[in-house]
Each structure stands twice: as C-alpha cells, then as structure tokens.
Swiss-Prot record:
Entry's Gene Ontology cellular component terms: mediator complex; nucleus
An example Gene Ontology biological process: negative regulation of cell-cell adhesion
Entry's localization field: Nucleus
The species this protein was found in: Schizosaccharomyces pombe (strain 972 / ATCC 24843) (Fission yeast)
Record gene name: srb9
Keywords assigned: Activator, Nucleus, Repressor, Transcription, Transcription regulation
Top-level taxonomic group: Eukaryota
Protein name: Mediator of RNA polymerase II transcription subunit 13
Keyword Transcription regulation: yes
Complexes and interactors: Component of the srb8-11 complex which consists of rb8, srb9(TRAP240), srb10 and srb11. The srb8-11 complex associates with the Mediator complex thereby blocking association with RNA polymerase II and leading to reduced transcriptional activation by Mediator.
Pfam families for this protein: Med13_C, MID_MedPIWI
Family, per entry: Belongs to the Mediator complex subunit 13 family.
Length: 1225
C-alpha cells in the first residue's frame, strides 16, 4: 500500500497572541512515502500539521498549525479516500494530525488528561484515537522525536494562551508579565509598582517526561498608568504590550482607536473600551505614530521607586530582548525622518501602489489617499502594517533552493493574500503629519551578538538539538531599512543559561543562583476547566527578583504577590477576601458535653484517655500488650480552668495535628486521595470533631479502633480500669479515613543572605503563619525541647534560618527571648503532674526542665504586653505533640491565674517543630544542618480547611510530611499500568436499574480513553433485550481495536437470575479483532450496625464454601466503604423515583450511625482466574476513582454520579501486596 500525501506549499503558524516575535509568514511541507520522517521534518521545519481550515479570525488555543493540502492518488485510491474521510471528520476538530504512509496520527488536546504530580503516557495509533502507551519512551524517540518536540511546543503555547486569558498575564516581547496581583498591591502596602517578568519554560526530563515552570528574568517593568506625572515621561522609551514594540511616549492624551480595541479583544483577550485613557506613541523602528492604551504601556527600569526623578536615566539594557518584526533595537531621533516625511507626502499625492510577489503570497501595500491617518492593508480581509514586506530570497536563504522538492510546483500553490494574518497597527490619531513608506536600499540589521542573545533568552527546551537546518532568519523590508527577524518558532536548539540576579545591594552576592519558580501551571483537559484543577493551593508566580533588592523589603509581603484561589479564576478582578480568620469554637462544641475537660475527667482514673487512645492506635500493628505506665504523667490537673476548645484549637493549629488521628500512620499505600482535601468539610469534619471530643471525654467508642476490640478489652481489664463496661457494638469510622496530600506550596529559605524560592524541598517541611495578611508582628520566642541536650544546636540553627526569612519577608521580627531564664533551648517537662513521678528518667528530666509555672511567671513579669511564641522541638510522634499542646495550655492557664490581662489569646502562640526536619542524607556527617533546613513561610493561606465558611481559623493546619515537587511535572506515562499477571486491556460495562423503569449503562476502558453512557427505558422493552443491546454496543467497540480485551460487566445492585442467565449464556463473537474474556458480577450496598461489625474481621476478599448457580465459578465478595452511593437521574420523568442506592457520607448524618458498605461479587469469570480478576477490578476501581477526584473528570468505572471509594485499610494494603490466592473467612 503506497500513496503520496502532498501538503501544497503552505503551512503557517497562526499568530499567537503571546508570542508575536515568533511568526512564520510562509513555509511549506511535503511528505513522500519514501522520504524518512525525520529528514522531511528537519528539512522543512514543519512538524505537525492540522488540517483544520482557517474559518475564523479568532485564535484557537487548541490548534497550532493550519494547512492546505491535497491528496495525490498514486498507487492506492482506497488509502487516499480513507485519508480524505479522516480529513473531513477532523476538519472542524481542534486537533493536530500527522499523515505518514497509510496512517493518520491525531493529537487531540481535549483528550489529554490533566493529572498533576502523576503520570500519563499516550501513543498515536493508526485509528487516529488516543491510547496512552509508550510514545515518549526511549526506544521511540529516534523516530518520533520531531513529533515529540512539536507536541511539546503545542503544550507550551496552549498553557501560555490560557495564562494570558484566564489570569490576565500580558505577553510582552516573548515573555509573560503577570498583572493580576493581590488587591492591596496597588493601594495599601506597596509604594512601587514593579512587575517582574517571567518566562514559561519547558524541559525534557529522562524517559521522555516533560515539565512546565515559570522562570524569572532580569526584567522588571512598570505600568505607565501608575506614574503620577506622565508629562515628565514624555520622550521616554517605553515598551508596548502585548506586541513588545519599543516606542517613545509623545503625547499623554490621544484619541482612542476602535480598530485597536477590536484587535486586542479578539486576538489577545483584552477587554478594553475606547473610553479608557490612551496616549500617543512613536515606534522607534519606523517613526510610525499612533495611539495606544495607557494600561498597556510599560517602563523598563531597575527596581527604583516611581517618584525617583532619575528613573529615565536608569533604563535597563534591552539588547537581550526578542523583538517582533517591526522593531529594531536602536533608537532613532524623530529629526532623522524629516526628509522622509516630505517624500512620503509627494508619494501620497501620486497614489502609488507597490506589489511584490514572493514564494508563497503576493503582498500589496496600499496607502490611504485621504488626510486621515494612513491604513496599510493587504488586498484581503487581512491587513499588515506598512513596515512589512516579505523578501522571498531571504525566505529560503539558509538552504539550497534547487534541492527544494516543492519549488518546481510553486505555481500551483493557490496561496492568496488572505492566507496571511498580521496584527493591524492602529490608525494614527495624533495631529501630526503622517509619514509614508520610503523604500530605500539601506538596511539595518541586528548585531550577531544581539541575535544570539535574543535566541538564548527564548523560552525553549534546553535538551533537544534537532533543528540546525531550520532557517534562522528572514529579512523583512520596512520603509527605509531591513529588519532581521528570528524565524525559529521551535527554538529547540537553545540552551537556557542560569539567570543571575542584578542585585543592587553590595552585601548580596551578584552570582547568586536564583532557583526556578515553582509553578502549578496546569495543562488543560478541557477549555472550561483549564485551571479548576488547581483552584486551591496553586501559586503561579512570586517575584523573587524583587526579593533581592533592599528597597522592596521595606514594604514587601509575599502574600501580596501570589495569585488568589477559587474566586480569582472565575473573575478578571480580584475579590477582596477577609484574611483575618478567627477560630469558630462552636465547631468543636457539642450540646451534650461541657466546656471544661476536668469536669468530665474521671477522678479515679490514672490515665489520660487522650494519650491512651493514641498509644493504642500507634501500636496496634506491633503488639496486643500495651504499656500504659507513661500515661500517668499526663493527668489534667483540676486547677486548669481553660476548656476543651483551647486544647483542641492548640492541637489543630499545629503542623502535626493530622498525626494525632488514628488513620495517619495506618495508611501505607501510595493511593493518596489529595482531592479529598477539598471535600474536607463534607465528610471529615464531624468524624474528627467526634473523635477528639469523645477521646477528651473518655468515651470508649473513639478508643477501641483495633481489629479485635474484644482482645483489646481483655488486655485492658487484666490490670487497668476499663473505660467502658460494654465493648463497642461498632467500629468507629475514624480509621476508615485516608491520608491527605497537601497542595503545592512555595518554599522560601534564607540562604547566603538571599531570600529565594527553594526548588529542592525535602520530604519534611513546615509552614509558619503567625498573623493575618498585611500585619507585621514581633514575637519574643522561647525554644523548648523535651531533649534539649540533643537538639540544642540544631534548634538554634533552625531558628536563625526562620528568623532571617521571617524578617526579610517583612512579617515582623522573631527575637530569642532574653529573660531571667538563661537557657537558649529550654527543656520542658512532659510530666505535667511533677509531684507524682513514676520513672527515674522522667524525674531527672523533670528536675532540669522549665516548668510551665516558671514560664508563666517570666511572661507576666518580664514580657507583659508583648507577643510570645513557644517553639516546641519534638520527636515525630503524636504523643509528644499532645504533651506539648498540653504544656502550652498549662502556661496559658497559669498566666490567667496570675491575673495578667495583657496577654490575649492572640499574644501567645505555639509552633511545634518535628526533629525529623533536621534529618537529611548528610545529617550524620555534619554538625550544622542549617543548610538542609527548608522552612516554608507560607503566608498565602489557601488551606482547603478554610474554604468552608463555617470554619474560621487564624493559622491553617498544614500537612507536615509530604514531598513537594520543585516543578509541575507532566510525566507522560500511564497512571494505570497493565496488570503484570494479565496484560490485556479491560472494558468496564457497568449498569444499574432505577426501580423497574430505567436502566443506565456506562462503558469505560481501564485507561480512561473511552467513556459513554446510554439509557434504556424498561417500559418499552424487556431487560433481556436491553442487555442484548448493551452487549452489541460492547462488541462493536471491541471490534474497532486490534488488541485483547477483558470485558468486566458489573451491575450496581443485586443481579436477578434472569440477568445472570443472560450473561452466562452470552456468546462472544469469533470475528472480533482480538481475544476477549468475560467477567460478570454485581455490587450491592449493605447498611446497619450488624454489617459494619464484620468489616474488620474480614480478609480483603473471601470465597464462599459452596458452589453457586451453574457451577461456573465461586462467588467472590469484597466489602469496602462507600463515600457516596447515589444515582440522580437527570430525566424529568424519573425525578421522583428513589434510587436503589442509599447516600452515605461516612455516617455524617446526625440521625444515622451505620456505615454504608459495598460488596463486590464475581459470578462468572471466563478464561481467567477469578481471584486475579478481583485483584484487577479493585486496582482499576481505585485508580480510576483516584483520577476522577484528581482531575474532576469522570474516569470512574462505575456509572456517572457513583463515586465509590474503597477506604478500608486492609483493602489498600491488599492493593499493594502480591496476594493472588483467596483466604476464606
């Protein structure tokens, strides 16, 4: 099979709104079946072709290239016809396609999933559909490297477009200018208006992985609209956004241009009006005068205050900028064009028209014949500025024209002026005489050094050097000079040097390395949900260059420079948020419980139930016999007057508070449901509240969480008081919750006298947030440790890092308290009741420790009226956290009893630091660990806990132990690898019936590439007929793929005998493309205390001892927790039909005490071991549900609106194991 595909002489990259300097005015591409792919692409410089026809002037963010081609039928008419059919189907799709031989490869941006921090790979198949395989693995890179490179550029352009559109970024000379800042940026805290310029970078990592991140440049620009006296800035060189042109400010008042408003709106997304302020400017390259919106004019200067009179004399060097075609980087005085103006006037009278025919188009420049400002336009709906004239000789200057396989057919191109798309410079509205073009023979070119520097500053991948043969330059004739323009839109051969800071402070090393920005630049899975994936926790930029100048420290706060969260994404303007968040004490209150812990404490009990519960939980996997002797030291004293809420708030305000929950250390798998953090208020608030409250009140239902409550009770009753006479009838739901994954955050560290972003954060990190936004607060600090001799030097070194970073972020000062207590790091006693010591070691520690009464006395006598911060350095253990919080509460209570009313709650703060923060690979070989210390001064409060308005907090409870990536890493590999035991794809056919009226079926493949849903009304047909239609749809889909398939049919709800017989007798057609096996089962929901008690006694799955039905297989069942089981029917006819599945949120309902359970039963398993099939189903369910929560995209293998979460601990442990055989219960 052989045929030729001829892409006729024309491929153009559309003028993207953010990279005006990267234009391809004309090019061409031809691919013969006997020409190697890489050779053809390197030769012509065009990689991927989209066959979407140019139908609109609107920029399409999902399509990069446009092409016109025709299929030349040579040897095979059918193949050419097939390709044409594909072209017709894809004509109106936002795709990028590539034709080779008889294959048509399609890149579809809509189909690419958005999975931050996870991996997904894909390959283009001959069907044109997506299938995530190994496109970017090393063995494929040799052949598909060009496709790969261009695809990366497509990703980059898409991300750039949406940054500009959604976040009000402004493209300026090929880089980005973030304009959306905190609302107080312009009015409250800042007295300078510098905007750091960032560059979107992409890098190619090992195994074909790619990553995006924002990188700082040395440029800082200032909005001309924020200059108080514009008259003083006349004749000042400015930069025009988004074109990037250099211009001179000639007038502070000018008429608006409707043409410019329209162009900026449709091509750049700027919603401007003609009523906004406009200024008159003159292009430096051509002396063309016109008007421009004031808010899109910028000054380029060093970090000086705007009221500095020497501003114009401190302009930064612009030689490193990438300039568009109509700009040259040398300033010309207006007097230079006096004679040209006279000549232009004569030519205007003669009414000349000049045409020039090029390799791909005929460009006609037509001047206006009126006294109004001149319009230069091409003879089409498009227009071009007067400075543009294409030179065909320069277009092909870098390669031999005689070797060009297209030049012999150049007359057949059929390209017209309409194929060119230039930005229209506005009409000149100033009252000055216009200058007509004067085509002289003079030519001005950029120096080679400038060109090279310009290329080196481009935002490209540093690792791919495959385009040496692409034409680097094209010369464009302007009115009296020739401008050399960079013509390499891919820029893949460029190495990006490390950016060094231009630092004015002599105390800061000028060669200091500035790490890359950590940027959650999300890749769009759909147009509407581009940035919804990181509507929490995402930090898109932070002005590190500004942090390096001392002037900025006087009024700088990181909080004022970070993009906001949910509200900002849906709005072009910032929504003022109240960052002063108070505790809601009622959140942890209950009408059934008093506010004082001591009132409910059992005076006869020798054990503090709070620590008792945690000791049980943290040791449940080690031994059934527990030593409770240490708990004796934690009895709450009757003299404590502070209530339960104070202790709870102290715990929840700490980084480590998650570890006080029983499920923290019990989860060992990698299935971290990070998206569940967003749903905190919906399913976790009440369990945590109940759990902590009941433990504080001594109720046993929150204590007995082990697998065998009876054995635990037995061990308790052997020598200790039982907390409850009756064993619990149910297992508390606290253990069923999963671990959390924290949103990405920017890390700041102070190292080598420079505050910068840390791109290599370790696993252990902390967040420090001591006051609301916009406040500066000083603290007197006490450093306390339960092991002061061992941690003293490390703690002081750590504190100094925090102190310097805190001060340089202009948050205030942290002063190591100089009081009558001389120890720099004090020990604190974990034995609250020091009169009743039980251990010699504890006694020794207590004798040398600083008691809470002593600390309270020092605070009252020496620090009255000041803010005091207690730094507790603790072992990485929940027990120590609770002791430190209890110690802090005792200090507050003692201060209160001493009668000092000057200390308010906000004046006393606690911060717990785990000793594990000092752990590092080199910690055993060095005495100083400050170099390895990573401190997160995360004052941009976007904790998901705070999203719910009912929970107000001043400090967020950040997750401590969580790795943090330095960049957003798109690892293009599969999130759901094929089962090593099976090796086939799985198609999940899941259906359910709503009463007896409606059947809903959903098809998903295990890789999330195929998903569809159909509804069948059972009034019109029997259920067997509906199942037969489902089977036909299934086989139709299977027959379209050349691969082996496992078909998994699962019903939600009990399966009737008629349904079972249908599936048991189902015949798999023999004419399918691959081998197909069938597995059939059902999922059922169980409710009630009786069923929940079985959960912790069941092994991950069990097999019944009896053979069921027709002896086809054993019935396998598995019990798992359900977060939500509901089937809302979107059809009006069935709105009143109650669903068969109950809705449950882990017993959050006040009136319900049961847990909803899900049993998965396998009835039929043809051609596969049923236990391996159950293993496969569980893995698919877990991973696909995980994807659904992470991406807001329904990749669930259950029908839509059924979100099943398998939370059980044994289940997750089973998923990480290699169990392949059943265990009978």
């Amino acid at each position: 099979m052989s045929y030729q595909v001829c892409f006729k002489k024309y491929v153009k990259m559309r003028q993207w709104p953010h990279v005006l300097s990267l234009r391809v005015y004309a090019s061409y591409f031809l691919l013969y079946n006997n020409l190697p792919l890489s050779s053809a692409m390197v030769h012509d410089g065009v990689h991927l072709i989209s066959i979407k026809t140019i139908l609109t002037d609107q920029p399409c963010p999902n399509t990069i290239y446009y092409a016109k081609y025709q299929v030349q039928r040579k040897d095979n008419e059918d193949a050419a016809s097939l390709l044409e059919d594909k072209e017709a189907y894809l004509r109106n799709q936002d795709c990028i396609v590539h034709a080779k031989n008889d294959l048509l490869f399609v890149y579809d941006f809509q189909a690419i999933p958005s999975i931050p921090e996870e991996s997904s790979s894909f390959m283009l198949l001959n069907s044109g559909a997506f299938s995530r395989l190994a496109l970017f693995q090393k063995d494929e890179l040799a052949l598909l490297l060009d496709l790969y490179i261009n695809f990366l550029q497509g990703l980059k352009k898409t991300v750039l477009y949406w940054l500009c559109k959604e976040y009000n970024f402004v493209p300026i000379y090929g880089v980005l200018l973030p304009l959306k800042l905190h609302p107080s940026f312009d009015t409250q805290l800042w007295n300078i208006y510098g905007y750091p310029v960032v560059d979107l970078q992409l890098s190619v990592l090992s195994k074909g992985h790619i990553e995006f991140y924002l990188k700082p440049t040395r440029q800082t620009v200032y909005r001309l609209s924020e200059v108080d006296n514009l008259v003083k800035k006349l004749d000042t060189v400015i930069r025009l956004a988004p074109t990037g042109c250099l211009a001179t400010l000639t007038s502070v008042h000018a008429n608006a241009s409707a043409q410019t408003v329209d162009a900026l709106k449709h091509r750049y997304g700027f919603s401007l009006t003609t009523t906004s302020k406009w200024v008159g400017v003159t292009l430096e390259s051509s002396a063309l005068e016109f008007s421009w919106p004031l808010e899109l004019c910028f000054l380029e200067t060093s970090a000086l205050r705007m009221n500095d009179d020497s501003l114009s004399s401190n302009l930064t060097d612009l030689n490193n900028l990438v300039l568009p075609s109509n700009v040259v980087n040398n300033k010309k005085e207006l007097t230079e064009f006096a004679n040209e103006e006279a000549e232009a006037s004569d030519k205007r009278k003669e009414g000349f028209t000049e045409k020039e025919e090029t390799a791909d188009a005929v460009v006609t420049l037509v001047p206006s014949h009126s006294s109004s400002p001149v319009n230069y336009s091409i003879n089409s709906a498009k227009s071009t500025p007067a400075s543009i004239k294409v030179n065909e000789e320069i277009l092909v200057a870098d390669h031999n024209v005689s070797d060009d396989i297209l030049m012999e057919e150049i007359d057949d191109v059929g390209i017209t002026e309409a194929d060119f798309d230039y930005f229209d410079l506005p009409n000149v509205e100033e009252k000055v005489e216009m200058i007509e073009p004067n085509f002289a023979n003079t030519m001005t070119t950029l120096d080679n050094e400038e060109i090279n520097t310009s290329i080196s500053q481009s935002n490209t991948s540093p690792n791919l050097n495959t385009h040496e043969n692409i034409p680097k330059q094209m010369e464009i004739q302007s009115d009296d000079r020739m401008v050399t323009e960079d013509l390499n839109p891919y820029n893949v051969e460029v190495d990006i040097p490390e950016i060094s800071l231009n630092i004015s402070d002599s105390k800061i090393p000028t060669s200091a390395y500035m790490p890359s920005y950590y940027s959650a630049v999300i890749f769009p899975s759909s147009i509407s949900s581009i940035f919804q994936k990181y509507n929490y926790g995402g930090k898109y930029w932070c002005p590190s260059p500004s942090l390096s100048t001392e002037d900025l420290f006087e009024s700088f706060s990181v909080a004022e420079s970070v993009t906001s969260t949910d509200e900002d994404i849906c709005s072009t303007n910032f929504i003022q948020q109240d960052f002063t968040m108070e505790y809601n004490h009622d959140f942890f209150s209950s009408s059934k419980t008093p506010t004082n812990i001591s009132e409910q404490s059992n005076p006869d009990s020798n054990y503090d139930t709070l620590s008792l519960a945690h000791q049980v939980l943290m040791n449940e996997s080690k031994s059934a016999n527990f030593d409770f002797s240490f708990l004796k030291s934690l009895d709450l004293q009757p003299t404590i007057t502070l209530g339960k809420n104070d202790l709870l708030n102290a715990i929840l305000s700490q980084n480590l508070w998650f570890r006080s929950l029983p499920f923290w250390k019990s989860m060992t798998t990698s299935f971290m449901m990070s998206q569940d953090v967003l749903n905190f208020s919906s399913y976790m608030r009440k369990p945590i509240r109940d759990y902590l409250e009941k433990i504080l009140l001594g109720e046993s239902s929150a204590v007995f969480l082990s697998k065998s409550p009876e054995n635990y009770l037995s061990s308790i009753n052997n020598g200790h008081h039982a907390l409850n006479d009756n064993p619990p009838s149910q297992v508390n739901f606290s253990e069923t919750l999963v671990n959390f994954s924290q949103p990405p955050r920017v890390l700041l560290k102070y190292n080598e006298k420079k505050l910068s972003l840390d791109s290599s954060a370790p696993e252990n990190w902390i967040s420090l947030c001591l006051q609301p936004y916009g406040e500066s607060k000083d603290f007197e600090v006490f450093l306390l440790s339960s092991k002061s001799p061992d941690v003293s030097s490390k703690a002081i070194s750590f504190f100094y890092d925090v102190q310097l970073a805190y001060e340089n972020c202009k948050l205030g000062k942290l002063n190591l308290s100089e009081t009558s207590i001389n120890e720099r790091v004090m020990g604190f006693s974990t034995n609250i009741n020091e009169t009743d010591n039980y251990d010699d070691n504890e006694t020794t520690q207590s004798d040398t420790a600083t008691s809470y009464e002593q600390l309270a006395s020092v605070c009252v006598n020496e620090l009255s009226g000041k803010n005091v911060l207690f730094f507790y350095f603790l072992e990485d253990d929940s027990e120590k956290l609770l002791k430190a919080c209890q110690h802090f509460i005792c200090v507050k209570d003692s201060i209160k009893r001493l009668g000092d009313n000057k200390f308010e709650d906000k004046s006393l703060r606690i911060c717990t630091i785990p000793n594990s923060i000092f752990d590092s690979p080199n910690s055993h070989t060095t005495n100083s660990n400050s170099f390895f210390t990573k401190v997160s001064l995360d004052i941009y409060n976007n904790d998901p806990l705070l999203m719910d308005g009912s929970l107000k907090r001043r400090e967020p409870a950040f997750l401590l132990k969580k790795p943090l990536l330095s960049t957003l890493n798109y690892q293009l590999k599969d999130i759901n690898p094929r089962s090593s035991a099976l090796g086939e794809y799985a198609l999940h056919v899941t259906y359910t019936t709503v009463e007896e009226h409606l059947l809903i079926c959903n098809w998903n493949d295990s890789y999330g590439e195929f998903e569809t849903e159909r509804r069948y009304f059972l009034q019109d047909l029997e259920i067997e007929d509906a199942l037969q239609q489902i089977l036909e749809v299934t086989f139709t889909f299977l027959n379209s793929m050349h691969m082996d398939w496992i078909v998994i049919v699962m019903k939600i709800g009990e399966m009737s005998d008629a349904e079972y017989l249908f599936w048991d007798q189902a015949i798999i057609p023999e004419n399918l493309q691959g081998n197909v096996s069938l597995t059939v089962g059902y999922c059922s929901a169980e409710h009630g205390p009786g069923s929940t008690s079985k959960v912790f006694s069941r092994i991950p799955y069990s097999a019944s001892s009896t053979v069921i039905r027709n002896n086809s297989s054993h019935e396998l069942s598995l019990v798992a927790f359900i977060r939500e089981m509901a089937m809302p029917v979107p059809n009006d006819e069935f709105k009143k039909i109650s669903t068969i599945l109950a809705r449950g949120y882990l017993a959050l309902d006040e009136d319900e005490s049961y847990l909803p359970l899900l049993s998965i039963h396998l009835l039929i398993s043809r051609n596969h071991d049923p236990y391996l099939m159950l293993n496969l189903i569980l893995k698919h369910y877990l991973s696909m549900i995980y994807l659904q929560f992470r991406t807001y995209v329904s990749f669930s293998s259950l029908p839509l609106h059924i979100s099943t979460v398998l939370y059980q601990k044994q289940l997750l442990q089973f998923m990480a194991s290699d169990i392949t055989h059943p265990v009978t219960s």
